[in-house]
Each structure stands twice: as C-alpha cells, then as structure tokens.
C-alpha cells in the first residue's frame, strides 16, 4: 500500500535520447527525412518549401494561398476535399511563416493509399476558386484590422524597427487595403513560385514500414517542381545598435505592452548552449528572477518572460510583458537591475538546481513523442541549428555552473544595446 502522506522521491532527468533521423534522396532530387518509431500505425508527413512572408512580394497573398490550398482542385471541390480527409480520420493543414511554407498531414498508415493521391493533386492542381478567395480575403482583412488595434502587435512591430535594417520585410508597413485587391491570378502566381517552383524538404515520422515507405516514395517521386522558384531573402539583424526606447501612445488601453530586444551578435555554439539556461534563470519560467521580483514582489505585471529568438537573420534576447502604462518605465529599470545582479552575483545552488530541472523538463518534452521529435528536427532545419544540438544542450545543462551563468550574462546581456518598445496609454 502506498503511503500518500509521504512525498515521492524526486528523480533527476538524465540520458535523454532522441530517435535518430535518416535521410535519403528521391530520384527527382527531393530529400526525405525519416524518424521511425513503431508506437502505433500512424504517421505525420510534413513538406517544407523555401519561401515565406519575408520572401514573397505579398505576404498577404502568401497567407491567402496557404489558406486556400485545400479549397479545390481540378478534380475535387472544397467540400469534397474536406469530406475525404474527415472520412479517413486525418488532419491536414497548410501554413506559412517568415521563410517557409508548410503542408502537414497526420493520418493512419492504412489510409495513405487513399489520401496521398489527393495530396499530390492538391500540390500540383489547386484551383483557388474566386468565391473562396473573396471569403478568405474578408476574413484575413478583419483579422489584420483587429490585430493592429492591440498593444501587443504595435509594441512588437515597433521593437522590430530598432534591430532590423530599413526596408526589411519584417518592418515594412503593409497596407491591409491591399488584401482587397489580391486576385486569383496573384494567388496562382505565388502557388507556382513557392509550391510548384521549389523542391520541398519532406519530413516523416511514425511507424514507417517498408510498405508505407514504398507508397510515400511512389507518391513524391511524381511531385514535379520547377528549377526556378521563390528564393529566401535573408537580411541580418543590426548588431551595431545603442540602447533606446520608443513609445507609441494608444489611448484608452487597459494595459500597455512592453517588448525588449538585445541582439546577441557573434555567439559560439558552446556559448549559446550556456546562454539558453541563463535566459531561463532571468525570465524563462515561473520561478525566474523577473517573475519573482517584477510580478510577485512588486506586482507590476501579471507576467513577464525572457527568451532567445533564433532566426535565420540572427539571434535576439527578447523580454515581453504587459503592465499599466504608468509602470512601464519602472519595469524597464527593474529588468536592467536584475540583469546587473545576474552579472555580478553568483546564483545559489538551489536556484541553479531549479533552472536545471526546468530546462531538462522542457528538453524531455522533445523526446516525449515521435511527433514532438519530428518538430524538433524541423525547427533545426528552419533556423539552421545543428542536429546534434539536443545532445549538446543536455550535456551543457548537466555540467552548468553558477560561474557559467555569470559569464554568459556578462557577455551577452548587454544593456548598452537594450532596445525597448512600449505601446499603450502612456506619455510619449
């Protein structure tokens, strides 16, 4: 009988293992990446194309193209496509981010012979009906209009202007009225450039038997792509910056939004693996410095978070929070104070243990399921991180010392390069 009055022992996480990834190239030059684990007869298929919102002439056009991709082909209507995927109990989506467009299918292995021909048809013969385009455009316009009224959107956008070079797509103020003028021909042109014009990188996870692999190979070897297509436009973030704060007055807002960025610059892999838990100690979890002082002790915000944003343009330490407009400057001052303390005072063994346990717990989520492992490998590909980074991160956190955290904070938490943006009911 278990004595439930006694706390169970705490087990330290160690020896995390990721299922290895295998790669091979199809006869048409497309690379397939496979993570094979026989948990159940289900698989996830992800196709990634170079080309995202920063790379195309119209980010709204790309957003509409991805939302319309499943809404009709030369052989099937939108309703028929929806019914077929639902009938076979599958989940399908198409999305885009800054530099990639993604098509994802999760399905039972036994349904693949019925679903993959439809997938190939969607990727090669989508029609983008005009009536569907009109409905999606209205929905996108309403969503973008609403988003622009939020303090979170405005502060994030304002902060980007401080570390992205002028004319970078990240800070170009697209006119949402352009959404109303996007035509079917515009959508088809983007479809031809991104989906049909670029060889995708294919990722597979699940119980990938020889039978399943044969079906997948036979399908995607018939995927025809052009030699030319959408290219990625990578413009590095600014490194030679000096601390500054920009404010945007938005009247009648209950909360103000605060975004802080510190460009990292040249950071070796070994330093990066130490900087991540250092950022966790500062503001990466509920028991972090910023949460304990700014949220719990001073009550200046409901929540605050620090993280490292890793992109193809470069790495940035980001701190995000919402607070009353009158408290925004005080929050920034306290953030700087906590950074300086982290630089000058060694953290205790108790705090280091808390950071290590939280960090390892987050790492363990990556290996929890075959699909989370696949997502990890995809994220490595999309931000240019080595595939062995998982093992290196685990090794680093087990060997991390208080001195490592102090050194990382001194080296990369450069408050002389701190860029802050505040949007809300504040004085400019």
Identify the residue ranges that each predicted region occupies.
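A generic structural signal for beta-strand entry/edge sites
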Residues: 21, 42, 100-102, 255-257, ...
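N- or domain-start disorder-to-order transition segments that initiate the globular core
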Residues: 2-42
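M16/MPP (pitrilysin/insulinase) zinc-metallopeptidase core fold and M16-derived inactive scaffolds
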Residues: 44-106, 285-300
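Charge-rich, well-structured scaffold segments of protease-associated domains
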Residues: 1-6, 25, 80-230, 266, ...
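Short, ordered beta-strand-loop transition motifs
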Residues: 16, 26-27, 38, 95-99, ...
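His/Glu-based metal-binding/catalytic segments typifying zinc-dependent metallopeptidases
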Residues: 30-53, 58-59, 199, 228-288
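Short amphipathic
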Residues: 22-25, 242-250, 421-422
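Residues that act as N-cap/strand-start positions at coil-to-secondary-structure junctions
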Residues: 17-18, 86, 242
């Amino acid at each position: 009988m278990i004595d439930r009055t006694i706390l169970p022992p705490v087990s330290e996480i160690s020896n995390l293992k990721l299922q290895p990834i295998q790669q091979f190239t199809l006869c048409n030059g497309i690379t397939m990446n496979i993570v094979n684990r026989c948990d159940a007869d289900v698989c996830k298929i992800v196709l990634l194309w170079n080309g995202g919102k920063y790379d195309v002439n119209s980010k709204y056009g790309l957003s509409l193209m991805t939302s319309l991709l499943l809404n009709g082909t030369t052989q099937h209507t939108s309703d028929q496509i929806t019914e077929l995927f639902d009938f076979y109990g599958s989940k399908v989506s198409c999305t885009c981010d800054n530099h990639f467009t993604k098509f994802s299918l999760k399905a039972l292995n036994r349904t693949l012979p019925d679903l993959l021909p439809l997938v190939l048809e969607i990727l090669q013969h989508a029609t983008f009906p005009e009536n569907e385009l009109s409905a999606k455009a209205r929905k996108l316009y309403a969503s973008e209009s609403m988003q622009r009224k939020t303090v979170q959107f405005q502060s994030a956008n304002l902060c980007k202007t401080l570390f992205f070079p002028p004319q970078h797509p990240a800070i170009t103020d697209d006119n949402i009225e352009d959404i109303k003028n996007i035509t079917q021909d515009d959508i088809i042109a983007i479809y031809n450039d991104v989906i049909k014009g670029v060889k995708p990188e294919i990722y597979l996870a699940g119980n990938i038997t020889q039978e399943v692999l044969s079906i997948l190979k036979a399908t995607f070897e018939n995927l025809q792509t052009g030699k030319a297509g959408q290219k990625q436009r990578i413009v590095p973030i600014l490194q030679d910056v000096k601390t500054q704060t920009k404010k945007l007055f938005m009247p009648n807002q209950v909360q103000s939004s605060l975004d802080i960025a510190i460009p990292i610059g040249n950071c070796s892999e070994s330093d990066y693996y130490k900087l991540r838990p250092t950022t966790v100690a500062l503001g990466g979890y509920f028991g972090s410095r910023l949460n304990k002082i700014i949220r719990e002790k001073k009550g200046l915000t409901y929540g605050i978070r620090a993280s490292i944003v890793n992109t193809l343009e470069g790495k940035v330490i980001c701190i995000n929070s919402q607070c009353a407009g009158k408290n925004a400057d005080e929050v920034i001052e306290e953030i700087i104070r906590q950074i300086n303390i982290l630089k000058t005072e060694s953290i205790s063994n108790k705090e280091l243990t808390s950071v290590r346990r939280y960090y390892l717990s987050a790492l363990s989520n990556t290996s929890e399921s075959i699909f989370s492992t696949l997502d990890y490998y995809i994220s490595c590909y999309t931000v240019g991180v080595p595939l062995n980074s998982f093992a290196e991160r685990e090794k680093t956190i087990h060997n991390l010392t208080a001195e490592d955290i102090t050194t990382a904070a001194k080296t990369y938490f450069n408050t002389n390069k701190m860029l802050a943006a505040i949007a809300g009911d504040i004085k400019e």
